[in-house]
């Protein structure tokens, strides 16, 4: 394994439910304490560490006497609310024993989608890291209304890595790493020691494994690595049961699969746009506009738009799609959806005549547009 982890100064560590719970029946305090011992060792090396930890729902289920994961949203939220108390307590106790302060940070997609809240969250986390505190992060499951998670904690880990400009994301799981096929089904499956994050071949290889307690599978980890690569963070997917896995990784030992961020780092504002999971709408563009955006780095003009979908307002992040529906970019809309429909396929010189005013000549300016 390369020196990516050895040289990393700021690391986001994500641990899955199976590594911090007793097979889904409440938290495994001994396991969490072992992780905290390793986190403390990393801090003593001069590194900054953020922990993204699952386990709240499993702990809540135990405290409520539930043996199976509920399906109703309000029951999942109730379990999360109960379990967050225990999760925070265990981490606080274990980190305090190592001489470290801890902070619980609960995030939602809305916190990351709103630019001002995003910047506030970033400022808070960077301040905590500067104080030598270990933030322990989870989705604020109790107040999420559309679904119980951002998607999963793998995705949350990648979003946090981008939020704090981490050098590396470590995803610790109950699997050794990434294989060319599902090793449980294919005896010829080859272990992948190192690859480039974001390559289509990786997504094709990934299976859909997942347990009854957690929600993640290998595909979510592949996509998380792709997302983290946007801000320059490489990702390691490793088996969390390896003894001293974190310490061995930062020593350069070849544990797990390393997915290297090889693409140019995206500017912070554009990374924020790329990280949006829920978009208010989209526009389809003709082939000429597609070439201008993709190959020449131009702005999106109304004349290149052939269809407007959704209900968005000025300043919302929207997707830009090819005529085949493939997302090629996203950016901040200069006009609301109803306005965009009126000016679509029209030259910019006609905007004022059609709307009675003209905010901008572009539907999306190139400074507010990122290719995906």
From Swiss-Prot:
GO terms for cellular component: cytosol. InterPro entries: AceGlu_kinase-like_sf, Asp/Glu/Uridylate_kinase, G5K_ProB, Glu/AcGlu_kinase, Glu_5kinase, Glu_5kinase/COase_Synthase, Glutamate_5-kinase_CS, PUA. Keywords: Amino-acid biosynthesis, ATP-binding, Cytoplasm, Kinase, Nucleotide-binding, Proline biosynthesis, Transferase. Its main location: cytoplasm. Residues 280-358 form the PUA domain. The keyword Signal does not apply. Pathway: Amino-acid biosynthesis; L-proline biosynthesis; L-glutamate 5-semialdehyde from L-glutamate: step 1/2. It is found in: Cytoplasm. The keyword Kinase applies. Substrate binds at residues 54, 141, 153. It is an enzyme of class 2 (transferase). SMART domains: PUA. Transmembrane segments: none annotated. GO terms for molecular function: ATP binding; glutamate 5-kinase activity; RNA binding. Pfam families: AA_kinase, PUA. Its EC number is 2.7.2.11. One of its GO terms (biological process) is L-proline biosynthetic process. ATP binds at residues 14, 173-174. HAMAP family: ProB (MF_00456). Catalyzes the transfer of a phosphate group to glutamate to form L-glutamate 5-phosphate. Belongs to the glutamate 5-kinase family. This is Glutamate 5-kinase.
């Amino acid at each position: 394994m390369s020196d990516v982890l050895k040289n990393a100064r700021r690391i986001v560590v994500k641990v899955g439910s199976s590594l911090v719970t007793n097979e889904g029946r409440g938290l495994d305090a001994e396991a969490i304490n072992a992780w905290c011992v390793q986190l403390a060792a990393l801090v003593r090396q001069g590194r900054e560490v953020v922990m993204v930890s699952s386990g709240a729902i499993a702990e809540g289920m135990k405290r409520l006497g539930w043996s199976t994961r509920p399906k109703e949203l309000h029951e999942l939220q109730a379990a999360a609310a109960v379990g967050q108390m225990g999760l925070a307590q265990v981490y606080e106790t274990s980190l305090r024993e190592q001489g470290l302060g801890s902070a619980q940070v609960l995030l939602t997609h809305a916190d990351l989608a709103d630019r001002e809240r995003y910047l506030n969250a970033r400022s808070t986390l960077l301040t905590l890291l500067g104080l030598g505190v270990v933030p322990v992060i989870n989705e604020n499951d109790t107040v999420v209304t559309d679904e119980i998670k951002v998607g999963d904690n793998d995705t949350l880990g990648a979003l946090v890595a981008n939020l704090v400009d981490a050098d590396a994301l470590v995803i610790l799981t109950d699997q050794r790493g990434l294989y060319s096929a599902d090793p449980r089904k294919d005896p010829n499956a080859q272990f992948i020691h190192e690859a480039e994050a974001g390559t289509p071949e990786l997504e094709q290889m990934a299976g859909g494994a997942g347990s009854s307690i957690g929600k993640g599978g290998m595909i979510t980890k592949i996509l998380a690595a792709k997302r983290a690569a946007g801000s320059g963070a490489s990702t390691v997917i490793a088996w969390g049961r390896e003894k001293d896995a974190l310490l061995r990784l930062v020593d350069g030992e070849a544990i797990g699969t390393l997915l290297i961020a090889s693409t140019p780092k995206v500017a912070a504002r554009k990374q924020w746009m790329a990280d949006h999971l829920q978009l208010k709408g989209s526009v389809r563009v003709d082939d000429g506009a597609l070439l201008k955006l993709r190959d020449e780095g131009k702005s999106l003009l109304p004349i290149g738009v052939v269809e407007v979908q959704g209900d968005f307002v000025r300043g919302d992040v929207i997707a830009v799609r090819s005529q085949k529906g493939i997302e090629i970019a996203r950016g901040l809309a200069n006009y609301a959806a109803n306005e965009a429909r009126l000016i679509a396929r029209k030259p910019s010189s006609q905007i004022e005549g059609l709307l009675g005013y003209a905010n901008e000549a572009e539907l999306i300016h190139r400074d507010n547009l990122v290719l995906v």
